[in-house]
Design a protein with these regions (language model features):
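Ligand-binding clefts of soluble mixed alpha/beta catalytic domains
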Residues: 1-353
Length: 353
């Protein structure tokens, strides 16, 4: 179900767009709320504008109830048509194909330092067919990118960390955003491509009280439930539960591919050394000797998580040069397209909410 909201949707009517697969909201006109600003002032004494209560910008940027923000009615209708072009008419069928097109950009030069940010959209533009990427929830939970695209004409869903926003760390909202998107792709048979560059899930009292464990479990549950073809690409790093959330090897995607120099581990080298060898290092009185031992341990740890070493143990299926990544993905998704999905007699997940 697609909802293109041109005006207000109040009280019980606000649940109509909430039940839809996607909500397109007209900027300045569309709104949805359970209680109007006037009611809020009368009942709870809160003075608020219509936009603050339930406007299009609020719902597409704060609550996540809206998926797309458009400037006109015509733009909303055109966007709805484009959105539907990635889906089959029935879940029994395969997603429709389109004429193949070359990417619009060259593969970007990625920073060697895994802590330096880059724009993941540049990498996406270098992989998918030109002008085919339709980003969903662009204004909400920006540390994660989700959207539909075409790869050699085939429709795919993309889940990608965005190092340019919050370092690509997963938060409560980004976990919810990913879970909803993955469930939608699974429902309509759209294959999934994960582009992982993630330090892990956010930590601290604030996110714990917001339910980061519950939200993270929801995302990981969605990944494990997905029956569509899944390919995970480790761009530079994937640590901790972030590796699970991005369909890492433990969740047996159809393929787990890595770029040269990528790292996967329970945690990064510095964090791992501090966690495992803290007492040993603190027992060394000489600062120079402590630093020497720290560097020695760091080198040993990096050797253990070396991507070629992991590939030799079949943890990683392939280590691919950046220039060959698109052709590798095209070849693999084409092979997986003929796979028949086996359905269990009963399939009913109890999802963390």
């Amino acid at each position: 179900q697609v909802c293109v909201l041109f005006g207000p949707s109040a009280a019980g009517g606000a649940y109509i767009p909430a039940f839809c697969d996607v909500v397109v909201m007209r900027d300045g006109n569309a709104s949805m709320y359970l209680g109007s600003p006037r009611m809020a002032e009368m009942v709870i004494g809160e003075k608020v504008t219509l936009e603050e209560m339930g406007g299009a910008r609020m719902h597409t940027g704060v609550s996540g109830c809206g998926h797309f923000l458009v400037e006109s009615d015509d733009e909303g209708i055109d966007l709805a048509k484009r959105y539907l072009s990635y889906f089959p008419t029935s879940w029994h069928e395969s997603p429709p194909t389109a004429p193949p097109a070359e990417p619009a950009a060259e593969f970007p030069e990625l920073p060697v330092d895994e802590n330096k940010p880059f724009d993941m959209r540049e990498l996406i533009d270098a992989l998918v067919d030109a002008e085919s990427f339709l980003e969903v929830h662009k204004r909400w939970a920006k540390e994660l990118i989700v959207g539909y695209a075409r790869l050699d004409g085939r429709a795919i869903g993309i889940v990608a960390n965005q190092p340019k926003q919050r370092g690509g760390v997963l938060f409560v909202d980004s976990s919810d955003k990913a879970a909803r998107f993955i469930w939608t792709c699974t429902a309509f048979g759209v294959p999934l491509l994960f582009l992982a560059d993630v330090p892990g899930f956010m930590i601290g009292t604030q996110v714990e009280r917001q339910g980061i464990i519950r939200a993270g479990a929801k995302m990981i549950s969605a990944v494990s439930e997905a029956t569509v073809p899944k390919i995970s690409v480790i761009v530079r790093k994937a640590y901790g539960a972030g590796l699970y959330a991005m369909a890492g090897p433990a969740f047996e995607p159809d393929a787990c591919i890595a770029l040269p120099g990528a790292k996967i581990a329970v945690m990064g080298p510095q964090a791992a050394i501090n966690a495992v060898f803290y007492n040993q290092l603190q027992a060394i009185d000489d600062p120079a000797e402590r630093e020497r031992r720290t560097e020695e341990l760091r080198a040993e740890y990096k050797e253990e998580i070396d991507i070629l070493h992991l590939a030799s143990e079949l943890v990683i299926d392939a280590v691919v040069q950046p220039g060959d990544l698109r052709s590798e993905l095209v070849r693999r998704f084409a092979a997986y397209a003929s796979r028949e999905r086996a359905w269990p007699a009963k399939h009913n997940a109890v999802t963390p909410v």
